[in-house]
């Protein structure tokens, strides 16, 4: 199907370009979203009369996106999720989750603006690209951790998924437990031992 683009669309074309796309892509996405018109004579004339308004509206959206980008670019957001010892999440962090996290911080982001090739399934720092406008893209960091304290440690550069870290943490816990058991055993011996008289 031939269509007229009403805005710049990555890997497709610029505003005003007449391009050929698959029928389903046009019918299900581009036309309902108002990103394109069918390329017939009536729509070509309509586009030419509305071109100045469309360009002005596009410029306005771009400037709004740039204002948001200045505040949001490089920001870090924390996602607390349950994970196993190796850092494998029990679920995943999807575009919907990321959109909720960023929106909770006061920014209006839709899940369709998040470029994520696959869901996040490991704890760690993940750089995500946000497309605020076809011409404005920024990067944010999603810090996926088991707790906020772990997220802070990760932000400081500590890796929480390496075998050394896991075993060191387990050894520390074992040492603490052994110390507690020794203290309890000593206390029990003091209580249970009969007092010897001299």
Swiss-Prot record:
SUPFAM superfamilies: L9 N-domain-like, Ribosomal protein L9 C-domain. This is Large ribosomal subunit protein bL9. Belongs to the bacterial ribosomal protein bL9 family. HAMAP family: Ribosomal_bL9. The keyword RNA-binding applies. GO terms for molecular function: rRNA binding; structural constituent of ribosome. GO terms for biological process: translation. Transmembrane segments: none annotated. Pfam families: Ribosomal_L9_C (PF03948), Ribosomal_L9_N (PF01281). The keyword 4Fe-4S does not apply. Signal peptide: none annotated. InterPro entries: Ribosomal_bL9, Ribosomal_bL9/RNase_H1_N, Ribosomal_bL9_bac/chp, Ribosomal_bL9_C, Ribosomal_bL9_C_sf, Ribosomal_bL9_N, Ribosomal_bL9_N_sf. PANTHER family: 50S RIBOSOMAL PROTEIN L9. One of its GO terms (cellular component) is ribonucleoprotein complex. The lineage of its organism: Bacteria, Pseudomonadati, Pseudomonadota, Alphaproteobacteria, Hyphomicrobiales. Binds to the 23S rRNA. Keywords: Ribonucleoprotein, Ribosomal protein, RNA-binding, rRNA-binding.
